[in-house]
């Protein structure tokens, strides 16, 4: 114990360091625990310090939990520490069942599906990716494939479970794609296997088994065969609401492997597996869209949605699309009223549905000057950045106690870029931050990224000298009081999907939950909570599952079975000019996340989940927690190239079936100021300035390649 008590230096070198190995840091920063730092040792290595004093291992401590060095003579002491943040999930987390497992004689894959109006390749109808009327009433399906071929057997068994019985003469299960469009080699009615009651719900079971490839006159099934199939969800008469006849999702099962996202080959449109490097959302990745419904890209179930989660997903979607004022569904009045949503809003709010801001699960649009920004969120504060006494922390323009509204008065143009100037009607806050609703896809995957992997990317003091100094936003868990890494929101203010959903319900819709039981309120305001009850816990559960299990489209680089070289060249330019300094390509998600859909997946979000100072050009006047006005969380880029058609929607000039076309609306960055992806790049300042400068230095042809890459995401 020869180090000075005031720390700052290690006197343990040579033989001492052999017996008392120093705890070293190799990635430039000691982190994860409060009061950690580092010193430079005599050999040039960086040693971790705690409260200024160097840390060592004792040579007899070999495994976690060893305390041999805690000497009664005082030559060694264990260090008690407080963790900087608590992980969301660890080895004590309760895990939902895996979507795939092995038995002694089979590979078993289990997942969920929903009804479709038409088939995946029928662009003439544009009716595959939308949601049918009453999608939430007894119309989810669970599918199980028992693959005996994978273990040396000869047949494949497919079991289908429904909540409403299928029509005995139309419960068709089509196997082995033949083409064109929706034609299969083997169409047959599934065998009815009986029903069972689980937790008060009656389930109906159907089965199809086969041991031949395509048809009975060919060979047997072999490893690697591509079994494309589609289950007809034709309901038996008597279902409460809606039509009886529906189709299902087109799935591709690779014998011996599992369900995979697919592309349609040029010519016969036969399905093939998309290379895994283009599965942006890991196993949640859905197939390419061939039904020409560009506004519906962000609405889809994860391909690997859990066997027991299909109905929960659909019920959560209903919560998302139903008014918290009247309970009415926004897509079709025939979908009726969700009574458990009705009457939950307090005296003030921004909008009455989640989908009113996140239309089609995309971002909000930028409206004309003078029009109310009623799909935006304005965080507000007093001169010191604290909640405004007359407004609270968020401007809420609707309800019986409206706080006023805001619109864009004009734009300031400079060098081809524009920034908005706002006009408030009512109280003008001293400080504020304008936010459009972000895209919702991939949220569960972002929640599943391991905290240590996020923190490993942080370099708050720019030790490596690359000009990028991202940092984690450590926030307080509103439920447990623990410190956690913030992940969601423009400034990473919430740690989980559930926290983010409950926070938005509170400030944006004026709905109280068990997580946030008190509504937003300024010190000079009264009757903030009103008399509305809290949101039912079950509805918050289903909404969280829905938001967590939305599928991600694959990178659009392989639609025709050959890699688009322009996209790949653009990817190299993106890497080479430094964009990946913030837009991290790849993570492996946690093995401890409760949801199998997002657990232990390789994903490509193109975000480091860190806060970065983006310079004065993008700064607002309001901080949020520890995030300054100039700091923003790196936005994930998956879905970027699809966003304009989702936000803008479609028009149908003729009204004829199949006549819809995209009306793109380009609105990028936190306030939608960027009218193109290139403008968004050119707005990058601060830590993003070097990459911006490098982009501007590219040849025009190289700029177009890089934009092509970004549009492919």
Regions inferred by a protein language model and the residue ranges of each:
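Compact beta-sheet-dominated domain cores in extracellular/mature segments
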Residues: 2-84
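Periplasmic c-type cytochrome electron-transfer domains
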Residues: 84-713
